[in-house]
């Protein structure tokens, strides 16, 4: 039987609010499967040794949130299965060789192409390592491609199989007793099968866009030691205010583009570019109207 996971107060203090919420729910031992949605394609702040770093979500999960786990695996339909450390990959390879020997398969030469086949192997591996009291985290990115939204009757066989495995994990008391976490990442929760989203054993955590203070912190980090090109009429404060609704990566691109190309970063340019970015993010479903009372 696995040991009871306990939180580290110092560790949690350096995490953003949504990550602390995930940790609190996990440490309650009532939830082992989470859906991360919203601003999942952005940089995430983490404070370590008094310094704030901004990491892509995948790296944040591997290093900050699940950095103390024995095994951290990430799967997505296009990229396949990856591991946070080579030792973890070697451990999986050994387990896979044992699976092949027992079942007469040859998955060591190549994993199944279909997600349900991969999830079935992961199910076997997770159970094996949970029995060894290993601390495990599994991240499934672009989860909407593994268990897409839709009526069960219209789902393909592989999608139904994947959905059943995910539901089985959410129902499994062994996962709750063990130190195991499964995170499904889907930018738009509505694109993920509602049988998972609404499952009582699954918690949805929305990652918000940065607020004005968070944007200001990030902008100041980006501008540290550099000067905006001549003709720029924004300060860090006005940039943080006018950047409402933008991701950190979008702000980073705006600043980097201006500096590298020696182009002035102006309020007019920022307003126009912000309009284009927000409308593009919405897939043309929104028309952004710039208020004349912004400042």
In which residue ranges do the predicted regions lie?
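Short, well-ordered amphipathic alpha-helices
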Residues: 58, 122-123, 163-171, 220-224
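AAA+ P-loop ATPase motor domain of ring mechanoenzymes
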Residues: 1-22, 31-37, 79-96, 196-295
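Extended hydrophobic secondary-structure segments that form protein cores and membrane-embedded regions
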Residues: 34-36, 138-141, 181-186, 239-243
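Helical mechanochemical/support elements of P-loop NTPase systems and associated helical scaffolds
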Residues: 53, 57, 114-121, 135, ...
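Switch/connector loops and helix/strand junctions flanking conserved nucleotide-binding motifs
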Residues: 44, 147-148, 190-196, 213-217
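Short, ordered loop/turn segments at secondary-structure junctions
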Residues: 143, 187-188, 210, 270
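Sensor-1/coupling segment of RecA-like P-loop NTPase cores
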Residues: 159-194, 212
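Extended, compositionally biased accessory segments flanking or bridging domains
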Residues: 1-157
